[in-house]
A protein has these predicted regions:
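Structural detector for internal amphipathic alpha-helices that build alpha-solenoid repeat scaffolds
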Residues: 1-12, 17-23, 28-43, 47-54, ...
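Active/binding-pocket-proximal capping segment
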Residues: 86, 101, 113-114
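Intrinsically disordered, low-complexity segments enriched in Gly and acidic/Ser/Thr residues
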Residues: 110-113, 117, 121-129
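TPR/TPR-like (Sel1-like) alpha-helical repeat modules
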Residues: 115-117, 152-160
Length: 178
């Protein structure tokens, strides 16, 4: 709990303390350290996190990609682009979202998929509420990019999605893009 609390403080002096424990941590402790470093958004964590990006455990890879996306360092772009091809869908999806927030469109095909209810239905573990939340996040991420395909998909969602919250978020994104 202390580790997570450090991450939520936005106090950069905790970064060296967290980084010191990262190499010797494992399991849930390591995941919490990675998460806390991502919350602090300090570039000093980029290198050590990159070293964990190829971890055999999908949960570790996912947490690393989310944290690297939060930090938004250009040094992480190659690792995040590689993660677009990870065998774990959540890793791919979060890589696309993180890259988009950095203005990198290499995951735009995945963002298009994430804004498609038909695509998300292929994943049984993603329930209706999670589909809606995923679409909302993808809309927000896509709004960082200047991509006509994403724009057209957002426009389509603003007019036709069955969920009012999605239509509203899509319209807000369109207003920002215009």
């Amino acid at each position: 709990y202390l580790t997570l609390a450090m991450g939520k403080t936005d106090r950069k002096e905790f970064v060296p303390i967290l980084l010191k424990d990262l190499p010797t941590s494992f399991g849930d402790n390591q995941l919490t350290l990675i998460h806390a470093l991502g919350l602090l958004r300090d570039e000093r964590a980029t290198g050590p996190l990159i070293e964990l990006a190829d971890a055999p455990d999908a949960r570790t890879r996912l947490e690393v990609i989310i944290s690297l996306g939060n930090i938004s360092s250009n040094k992480a772009v190659p690792v995040m682009e590689k993660a677009l091809h990870d065998n774990e869908p959540n890793v791919r999806w979060d890589a696309a979202i993180g890259l988009a927030k950095m203005g990198n469109n290499s995951g735009s095909d995945l963002l298009l998929n994430l804004m498609s209810r038909d695509y998300l239905k292929r994943y049984d573990e993603v329930d209706l509420e999670e589909r809606t939340e995923t679409i909302l996040i993808a809309i927000q991420a896509a709004s960082y990019l200047n991509d006509v395909r994403l724009y057209n998909k957002i426009r389509e969602l603003s007019q036709n999605d069955p969920v009012l919250k999605v239509r509203d978020e899509a319209q807000k994104a369109l207003d920002l893009l215009l």
